[in-house]
């Protein structure tokens, strides 16, 4: 086996991640791939942005993901687009796409309704992990809305079989718009983040690159400043990385940054809002 081909591993919530020898890191938290993505990107990012959304009906929310990876963030976002009946134009850049023989083994069971809490402190299942997105969407918000209450508290139902949906995401053509449903348009970008122009007029950014230790070139202040110029005022950026220097670089680049509680295994994460 090539030393650069990622290896499948099961995480504590039962969902799969990959370990990459190239960078010596996992694609997701080993405490739970689904619960990490649901908490940081769906809850603190997409659902928060949708709550603030005041654009006319039919206007697309433009999301940019740094690191397509396993496609889990895209899958959750597609599912949320169908649930909310909001059009999402989803851009995702990836320099090292995973091979077909590997992504065909991925499976995320996301089709059942979601309980709002996990009793007894047990490690949540994939379905229960998504409930953290309900809670995360309320973190750091103003007003008296009760934690756990949400416009998304109804059962989410099926997008379609989650495995076939994931395969459609991976098999979609690169470097062009691909309409996957009435509410979800995917545009995968093949290449290096430092060498390509960013999409314009962004409303939401999932900054999910490997760590600053593994990919320091993707955490430079100059890159954040370029990204800020491509964001609309009020755009939200979320990332698992809560390092102080990353926070300061984002702030100097034109974002207001807050630390928020992270998913299991992660004390804090960052959410930045374009000033």
List PLM regions with ranges:
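Glycine-rich SAM-binding Motif I of class I
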Residues: 71-75
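Class I S-adenosyl-L-methionine
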Residues: 243-275
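A short glycine-rich, Lys/Arg-flanked "PGG" loop and its adjoining helix->strand segment in the class I
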Residues: 220-233
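Conserved beta-strand signature within the Rossmann-like core of class I S-adenosyl-L-methionine
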Residues: 234-241
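Class I SAM-dependent methyltransferase core
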Residues: 63-65
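Rossmann-like AdoMet
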Residues: 1-61, 78-112
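S-adenosyl-L-methionine
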Residues: 106-121, 125-138, 152-196
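A short acidic, Gly/Pro-enriched loop at the edge of an enzyme's catalytic core
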Residues: 195-204
């Amino acid at each position: 086996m090539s030393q650069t081909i990622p290896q499948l591993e099961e995480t504590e919530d039962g969902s799969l991640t990959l370990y990459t020898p190239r960078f010596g890191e996992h694609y997701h938290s080993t405490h739970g791939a689904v619960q990490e993505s649901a908490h940081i990107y769906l809850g603190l990012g997409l659902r928060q942005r949708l709550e603030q959304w005041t654009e006319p009906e039919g206007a697309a929310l433009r999301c940019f993901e740094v690191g397509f990876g396993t496609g889990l963030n895209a899958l959750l976002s597609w599912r949320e687009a169908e649930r909310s009946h909001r059009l999402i134009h989803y851009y995702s850049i990836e320099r090292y796409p995973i091979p077909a023989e590997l992504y065909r083994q991925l499976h995320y069971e996301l089709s059942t309704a979601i309980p709002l809490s996990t009793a007894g402190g047990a490690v949540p299942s994939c379905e229960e992990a998504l409930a953290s997105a309900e809670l995360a969407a309320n973190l750091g918000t103003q007003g008296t809305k009760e934690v756990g209450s949400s416009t998304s508290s109804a059962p989410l139902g099926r997008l379609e079989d989650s495995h076939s949906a994931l395969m459609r995401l991976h098999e979609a053509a690169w470097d062009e718009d691909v309409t996957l449903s009435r509410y979800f348009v995917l545009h995968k970008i093949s290449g290096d983040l430092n060498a390509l122009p960013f999409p314009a007029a962004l409303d939401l950014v999932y900054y999910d690159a490997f760590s600053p230790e593994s990919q320091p070139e993707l955490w430079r202040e100059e890159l954040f400043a370029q990204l800020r110029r491509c964001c609309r005022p009020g755009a939200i950026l979320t990332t698992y990385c809560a390092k102080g220097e990353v926070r300061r670089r984002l702030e100097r680049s034109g974002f207001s940054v807050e630390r928020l509680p992270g998913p299991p295994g992660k004390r804090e994460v960052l959410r930045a809002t374009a000033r």
